[in-house]
Amino acid sequence: MPGSVTTAPAPAVMAGLDPAIHDLNPGDPVDDRVYPRIESGDGHDEFFDGAGDPEPLSPAGGVRLTGIDLAQPLSPAVKAAIDAAFLAHHIVVFPNQSLTREQQFLFAANFGPVEAHGAHRGENKRYGVAHVMSNLGPDGTPTFRFSKAANYHWHTDKPYHPAPPMLTMLYAIELPPAGGDTEFGNMALAYSALPEGMKRRIAGLRAVFRPAFDGTRPAVDHPLVRTHPDTGVKSLYIGNHSTHILGLPEAEGAALLAELLQRATQPRFVYAHRWRVGDLVMWDNRSLLHRAVANYEVEKYRRVMHRSVVRGTVPF
């Protein structure tokens, strides 16, 4: 098979939610404010047997968790640890997993109702399994033709829905020998770094979102600055599906969105995940943008992922 890679090393992890993380200035060193620990009631750092120390992934967010077999039911302690890491770091990486599509679906269902697949064809007709995403054509060979161009632009998943997803997870099945990364932009950090004048300018504005390739779906508007329902933290809610801003001339709104996107995707706000086979990565759609990176020969190497999306709530 072309494009094999080694499995991920086994770092370790557990992190908890600390409001101090949201007072950081971009560029601050990574320290305990960014990656606080969870402590169990008896004062021990390890939240459950088999977990080690946290491995922070970048100042922009992300943490790696080991010692968890996602193919097995989650204990209350493990679920609580994952929830805390997810809220604190926005991105959680579980390396060295071995999951069927059914097992991935069941893991995703721990976090809420799992959405049905948008494409009801071939391998994705069944509900109750993870959705197959790949660069493969009908004959099983790599091709750029079936890659969605929108995936290579900064976006959050399904913002053109009245209640966009709360989280997305991808599980790496086949990868090119190098490249095929996914980048994540931390919109909470990006918002916190805006000048106060810009924050006042965009307060109360609503952005209009449309799907990139479906002209029949009605547009939906959401707050340009949304509040996280679990943490209360504000973040920008933008991306390539946002077309204009309600109440502003279309050109002015588009220019403002472009300026915000440029500010929000500076390298200091971005974590780039370099995939390894067996990685399962889950991220918070309420506080992040993401994009695929075509930094490999798309028409030569296979890239196959399994995807699950968990339903969210109406942004406010």
Task: State each model region's role.
Residues 1-22:
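Intrinsic disorder/low-complexity segments
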Residues 22-280, 285-316:
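Non-heme Fe(II) oxygenase catalytic core, chiefly the N-lobe of the double-stranded beta-helix
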